[in-house]
Amino acid sequence: KIYMKKIHVGFLLSYDYIKLKNSIPPVYKMADKIFIAVDHEFRTWAGQKFEVEATFFNWLKEIDKDHKIEIYKDNFYIPTLNAIQNDTRERHLLSLKMGIGNWLIQIDSDEYIPDFKGFVNQLKKYNHYLDNPKENPIQIAGFHVDIYKYLDDGLLYVKNTCKVLLATNYPNYKLARQSYERVI
């Protein structure tokens, strides 16, 4: 089987969708494809309905000059599952849609990778893990800084960083983005 070894980035669209206007542009140029998962009835993991203004979808079309963005609609709310189980399920289905054999990067709407080009260049050093992902599942982590408050002249942030799981070669998620596989 020939693997594509592409950079596929996935986002989950929900009630905080407007934040995607900040998180999509930094990854657009380096991503081979961008997938945006949204419940087909616009429901959260807890089953609450939300609305998305048409102007947001217009904005997506405007910025998608290279036709990289795909909206993936599916039933992501199962009433017999709790919110974290629905979260995990949506991430898994999104990753399957993104295609095993590619780097599967999932970024939450309130997360930004300031040097996405550097992240991708580092990620490509591990492309050999895409040759047989089921036998060699890994997750790629980065560090994230929690922004406390935006100010007119900057921002306040929490000094201590923590690890965040951003990419995988094989999406066997157990809890949100966590698969409990080897982390690099």
Residue ranges and their predicted role:
Residues 39-103:
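Active-site-proximal specificity loops/subdomain of glycosyltransferases
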Residues 101-114:
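Short beta-strand-to-loop acidic/aromatic patch adjacent to the donor-nucleotide binding site
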Residues 7, 67-70, 137:
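Short, conserved active-site loop motifs that form the nucleotide-linked donor/cofactor pocket
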Residues 81-92, 112-184:
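Catalytic-site signature of metal-activated, phosphate-bearing donor transferases
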Residues 14-16, 41-42, 76-79, 110-112, ...:
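Short, solvent-exposed loop/turn segments at secondary-structure junctions
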Residues 1-29, 36:
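N-proximal low-complexity "stem/linker" segments adjacent to membrane-targeting elements
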